[in-house]
Amino acid sequence: NNLVINSLRNIPNAVSNLLNNNLINVHCQFLVDEIKRKNIENMFILGSGKLFSVAKEGALKIKEISYIHAEAYSAGSLKHGPFALLDNKTIVLLLVTSNNKEKLISTYHEISARNTNCYVLTDIDLDIFKNKIIIPNINYYEEILFVITLQLIAYTLSISREINPDK
């Protein structure tokens, strides 16, 4: 399929555009500043489908280089695990695409109702999400941009906590 091949060819440009996008960098820094300001030590990253694996990679990177407790969960298992731990000292990062938005809108409302800090990493702009980082939509292979953005958040968090991310 030409669309799949063209999307694959466009990945280097999409990654470059992502990393050089000032708005994305500002929103990542805002998230990091909130974590630091609120002295948050727990983070849950929720994804579904392919983005569950992305959530696991993001949680691992955050733990490894910023020393913040981060766990990944399938968005569908929220009520079977971390839901009981949600409070205003926790941050939840939802990974939302056009493919899973219907399911995750209700999850977003459930999290917000618990007075939990909820941020959305997404490739679609929906007004319903208050705090969001919008990354480019590249049709296929979007999980690559989600992983890189989570790595950027982990790196920025590490630097803000004065931790050398290369150790």
Language model features: what each stretch is:
Residues 1-167:
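A SIS-like phosphosugar-recognition module
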